[in-house]
Amino acid sequence: MSKVWSFQRWLIAFFMAFLSVSYANASDQVQNQETAKSKGKILVVMTNHSAYPTRSDKTGLWLTELTHFYDVAKAAGYDMDFVSPQGGVVPLDERSMKPIYVDKSARKLLADRQFMYRLNHTLAPSSIDPTHYKAIYYTGGHGTMWDFPDNKELKNISESIYRQGGIVSAVCHGVGGLLPLVGEDGKPLISGRTVTGFANKEETLSGIKSQVPFSLQNSLINHGAKYKQGFLPFTSYVVSDDR
């Protein structure tokens, strides 16, 4: 994952497709205070997994795949809850913390005590009521490959949000969280739908191919998805199909 992500463009494209963006007046009295009139809640999913099989460095959440989304969603008037498969602390991928990747937005949130408290005290899936959310967003980072696909509680939450008319979305390796989802017809939710996600060639180029438990690209295709990827690796690429 050694690259510079263009997630601001990705996020703008995503929200142009799915959300009507309107900027609310934020209070100057409390740092990081949620907008006064919320348009609803988004459930943001993050990994608890930090260990590679043989590498000494640690994986986890790729930081800006959270921070860029957080900034855009908050500016659009949405509240967010943070959840992880086990609840509690979310590890940060070591490489995502390098200066080349940590931009102004990420630095600001890293210095925000309230934001960091939430990152270190994420909710457990058992505490989530899906009816409270208009969308669910799976963040990325290699850690998600271990604890997103097999989590039955997150699966049930996502399916409930979708069936009540909500949006199911993901970025990068977080797309693995969509693999177990099943539609009302009993078929994989992504079957027949256009999706994207971290590509095989990107795993090879990033040097992590031998570490991950499965190929995300192959698994998406095996679940019936119409997999698409950008012409160049590690560049901004977004697709949407229904919600």
What are these regions (language model features)?
Residues 167:
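Active-site cofactor/cluster-binding pocket
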Residues 11-22:
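Bacterial N-terminal signal peptides
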Residues 1-11:
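Bacterial N-terminal signal peptides that target proteins for export
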Residues 27-164, 176-243:
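Extended, subdomain-level signal for the structured scaffold at the beginning of enzyme domains
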Residues 3, 25-28:
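Intrinsically disordered, low-complexity polyampholyte segments enriched for Lys and acidic residues
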Residues 171-174:
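Short, thiol/selenol-centered motifs that function as redox-active sites or metal-ligating centers
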